[in-house]
């Protein structure tokens, strides 16, 4: 009998502030045992790096819940996870700017509008070439998420 070893998983969430990333994590991933890594919660990049390193060293499944708008932002997680043999899945939140601004206005802790606009202006669409094993679009309508497979030719 041959036992198949399952790779640990790194999930990288991508999208504007108030696009639904944390809600998506809470609804679909928290109860599956993923470690939640969020710069807003950890407060400093150093703490975030320590937590990512801990997860990778212990082969823990984890979710990076940050805006991750650029390839460089995503590379800081993908490269070391690939080196540790992780399966890497990306979820790109397809929220419209107007929808994010509206949701942000309803938040208790609001992000300044100029911060959301700055993130919007630097978004680079992800690609499988970055090292993702899987990429998905996530849309949100009336508080419900819809997930579809990434098709690079349609971007």
Question: Positions of the model-derived regions?
Answer:
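Amphipathic helical hotspot of TIR/SEFIR-family domains
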Residues: 71-89
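Conserved GTP-binding G-domain of TRAFAC-class P-loop NTPases and closely related GTPase folds
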Residues: 1-14, 19, 27, 31, ...
């Amino acid at each position: 009998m041959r036992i198949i070893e399952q790779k640990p998983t790194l999930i990288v969430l991508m999208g504007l502030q108030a696009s639904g990333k944390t809600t998506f994590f809470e609804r679909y991933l928290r109860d599956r045992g993923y470690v939640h890594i969020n710069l807003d919660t950890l407060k400093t990049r150093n703490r975030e790096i320590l937590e990512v390193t801990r997860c990778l060293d212990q082969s823990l499944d984890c979710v990076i819940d940050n805006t991750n708008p650029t390839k460089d932002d995503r590379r800081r997680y993908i490269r070391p996870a690939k080196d540790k043999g992780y399966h890497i899945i990306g979820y790109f939140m397809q929220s419209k700017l107007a929808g994010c601004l509206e949701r942000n206005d309803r938040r208790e802790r609001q992000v300044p509008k100029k911060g959301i606009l700055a993130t919007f202006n630097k978004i680079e669409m992800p690609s499988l070439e970055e090292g993702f094993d899987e990429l998905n679009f996530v849309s949100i309508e009336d508080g419900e998420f819809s997930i579809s497979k990434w098709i690079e030719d349609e971007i």
